[in-house]
Amino acid sequence: MVYAALAGAAVGHSLGMTDEEIARGIAHYQTVGDRARVLHTPKLTIVSDCYNANPSSTAAAIESLRLLDGRKVCVLGDMLELGENTAALHRQVGERAAQAGVELVLCTGELSRSICEGVRSAGGTALWFPDKDALISALPETIRMGDCILVKASHIMAFEDVTKALLEL
């Protein structure tokens, strides 16, 4: 979303728009589907980014949590189609989450075991669940009032179900 905003600002400047007009346009931007969609409930802030996941987009999404208030929690699933370095790339995402100050990482999916390993190796807290249903069942015990939660995985993981469960807490 940041890159799109910067590109939009550049186009706006080239068309003679003022900084105020550009800022107003960016402030009113709404994402499509589950691409960096920020949802607010009376209890939580949820960043639902379930459409696609790769190491760079996941790292950027984790970094964006710094802009939001609340305890930082990531609910992460497998990033698919990464090739032969899949485990190492998942582990690096986990390390990045811990280094960024994420207090809790919840994962499901075989590949996401490496995310948990990365979180733990960097001194963070991570929980791995055998399937999405088990993860969803654990949400009421692990999520607190005021949490800011990133939900991100490759689309085939169907993490929109996790977002729906969080909205119902």
Summary of predicted features, one role per range:
Residues 7-169:
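ATP-dependent carboxylate-amine ligase
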Residues 4:
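Nucleotide/phosphate-binding loop and acidic/charged catalytic motifs
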Residues 1:
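Active-site cofactor/substrate anionic-group-binding motifs, chiefly glycine-
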